[in-house]
Amino acid sequence: MPTSVPRGAPFLLLPPLLMLSAVLAVPVDRAAPHQEDNQATETPDTGLYYHRYLQEVINVLETDGHFREKLQAANAEDIKSGKLSQELDFVSHNVRTKLDELKRQEVSRLRMLLKAKMDAKQEPNLQVDHMNLLKQFEHLDPQNQHTFEARDLELLIQTATRDLAQYDAAHHEEFKRYEMLKEHERRRYLESLGEEQRKEAERKLQEQQRRHREHPKVNVPGSQAQLKEVWEELDGLDPNRFNPKTFFILHDINSDGVLDEQELEALFTKELEKVYDPKNEEDDMREMEEERLRMREHVMKNVDTNQDRLVTLEEFLASTQRKEFGETAEGWKTVEMYPAYTEEELKRFEEELAAREAELNARAQRLSQETEALGRSQDRLEAQKRELQQAVLQMEQRKQQQQEQSAPPSQPDGQLQFRADTGDAPVPAPAGDQKDVPASEKKVPEQPPVLPQLDSQHL
């Protein structure tokens, strides 16, 4: 998996365990018992996707006296070849148990990572072979997912060493692409201007470049002139009494007996300030970081004889005895004096940008079409919704009308008017419609029966 490592972070992890600190760097206080007010130095993130696992393994191994002793006596080849990893068989049971648990946690983390990755790319019901997928992670042994063995330590060290060693090359490539993009945008901007405006923009650019080149002489990193300038201006000491050993001790910030990459890069600050000022429009801070990296690489190439990315006192003192240490009259050539790319590389880069832009435009067009289709679908749904609401309203109105028609009439004051119940009584015919009826056919109203009266004597 790709890694991105912040500047200066890769090799700060495990002094005084010097050899393994070529892979990591965990600042450790050499003084015997730690005081409560001594705060542990925060470990910088290497940028590796397995940084936490790597750090925790180192922290656990550091607690074992036997392994720590063997590590201090080992050289870089013993570590890289895997010879030191065999000492894992002799660490305490408690340490092995902690390492086993760390590995199980790492395997579990990778499984979840892989599952999320596969779910994003494939069908959810697809069966995933986690064993095969774990093989793409080279910092652990996928054949044994439960215990931490010598092979795990060997793979962890080798993978971290390789990944961190690739940091500088990746940084240079990133800077090249940055410079090509900057030039591409500059040319496109000039093409968009009229002739007079273009001439003015080109004149302004040339003026900025001229101001950027006008700076004091930059000393060669690691040279006598450069170190003496730090000695005088940063350390405030007499340049005529420059002492390389004292200089080394002063700038070994964590007193671990070596100058790591951050400690070396701190020595270049005065030189970089001669060329780059964040307040100046013509000074690019990305170029300054590239310059810092070039300076560090130059020192490492000439001073770090065993290529463990750490400068020991012996290596530093030996470098001050070389002829090149004092012969630096020409000074250091800054990054703008070396083209970061060729015209052919720029052409390929612009073709890549054009292809990517065309792809993005096509994708944007598809999204626009899909958005329009969704809009039309939404309009249809809204129309159907309005029709449905209108139909419901009409039904409610009809229902209300039917209820009003079936209700009894009401008096003017709003009260309902009810008729008296006439029973079986005949309804008189309207006047004028009555006909003469024979007396024999006329109904005589029935009289109630007459009861005989009883004399009071009979009671």
UniProtKB/Swiss-Prot annotation:
Residues annotated for Ca(2+) 2 binding in this entry: D304, N306, D308, E315
Domain EF-hand residue range list: 239-274, 291-326
Biased composition (Basic and acidic residues): 192-209, 433-445
Intracellular or extracellular location(s): Golgi apparatus, cis-Golgi network membrane; Cytoplasm; Secreted
Tissues expressing the protein: Minor constituent of the mineralized matrix of bone. Detected in calvaria, rib cartilage, liver, kidney, spleen, brain, lung, skeletal and heart muscle with highest expression in calvaria and approximately half the amount in kidney, liver and brain.
One GO MF term attached to the UniProt entry: G-protein alpha-subunit binding
Cystine residue pairs: none
Membrane topology type: Peripheral membrane protein
Residue span of region Binds to GNAI2 and GNAI3: 227-320
Self-association state and partner proteins as the record states: Interacts (via GBA motif) with guanine nucleotide-binding protein G(i) alpha subunits GNAI1, GNAI2 and GNAI3 with higher affinity for GNAI1 and GNAI3 than for GNAI2. Preferentially interacts with inactive rather than active GNAI3. Interaction with GNAI3 is inhibited when NUCB1 binds calcium, probably due to a conformational change which renders the GBA motif inaccessible.
Function: Major calcium-binding protein of the Golgi which may have a role in calcium homeostasis. Acts as a non-receptor guanine nucleotide exchange factor which binds to and activates alpha subunits of guanine nucleotide-binding proteins (G proteins).
Family, as annotated: Belongs to the nucleobindin family.
Protein name (Swiss-Prot/TrEMBL): Nucleobindin-1
Taxonomic source organism: Rattus norvegicus (Rat)
